[in-house]
Regions:
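Polar, enzyme-active/binding microenvironments
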Residues: 1-261
């Protein structure tokens, strides 16, 4: 990464990815309002957003059509601001109906969603986005935040694990409702996710009883999870994750770092 980041979020592919916002950490962190692009071998520049810096926003889409929604600002407020990225600049668009931080962003710019997250309480709602407007989707069965997630559209979105507490559940969205699938093998939160609901990957995060940070990876085939022999080179959490089941990226760490793996 061009600079150290923690609590950043990402989207895109291993050869065309995006990391957005986050903080410089670890003590008295500066909250960032910039993004940077990844081409598979290196990062390029930074692009400034219109709204003040946040951590723990929900990000989904691609490097040239991304959405960044909500987050937590350095004034201690959970926000409902939303911006879209076109590959060169950010534009403020319609706000979230419900402000959130640490929710799961899934899908594409014109077929995306934010599931769960935190505000005054941990949330169960799904907020769907069609590229212009936000509408209410199907509620998630249990209030959740900080889960690994993925999907390239609303209808192949998923998330696994997360808080409140260390969860092991996997939920898959069909465009209107969430359905439980096979549990992950090791409950975790603050981890990364990549891929779609039939071919997914989770990696890193915290595992019980905490605050141990993991380097472990699990693979999903649409019904069950298996522990992968491949592990992160550096145990990491709360970083920008993007890619597919077979080609994923995890950038940053907490405390803040500039590593990419």
């Amino acid at each position: 990464l061009p600079s150290t980041r923690q609590n950043a979020e990402g989207c895109g592919t291993q050869t065309a990815g995006l990391a957005s916002s986050g903080a410089t950490g670890p003590a008295g962190p500066a909250f960032l309002n910039t993004s940077c692009e990844y081409n598979g071998t290196g990062w390029s520049g930074t692009t400034t957003k219109n709204t003040p810096g946040v951590i723990a926003e929900a990000v989904f889409g691609t490097q040239t059509a991304a959405v960044a929604a909500g987050g937590y600002n350095n004034s201690g407020s959970t926000v409902n601001t939303v911006e879209e990225y076109n590959g060169s600049s950010w534009t403020a668009v319609n706000t979230l109906p419900t402000a959130q931080r640490s929710g799961m962003g899934c899908g594409a710019e014109n077929s995306g969603l934010v599931a769960g997250g935190e505000a005054a309480t941990v949330l169960t709602n799904t907020q769907e986005y069609d590229g212009t407007n936000w509408t209410a989707g199907g509620a998630i069965p249990a209030a959740t935040y900080n889960a690994g997630a993925g999907g390239t559209s609303q209808s192949n979105s998923w998330f696994a694990g997360g808080g409140d507490g260390f969860k092991n559940a996997t939920l898959i969205y069909d465009g209107s409702s969430w359905t439980a699938s096979g549990n992950i093998n090791t409950a975790r939160d603050q981890h990364g996710g990549a891929g779609i609901s039939t071919a997914a990957l989770i990696f890193g995060g915290r595992t019980p009883p905490g605050p141990a940070v993991s380097s472990a990876t699990e693979n999903f085939d649409g019904s069950s999870w298996t522990t992968s022999p491949a592990t992160l080179g550096t145990a990491a959490k709360q970083s920008a994750a993007f890619g597919t089941k077979t080609a994923a990226v995890y950038a940053g760490n907490d405390p803040a770092a500039n590593i990419t793996q």
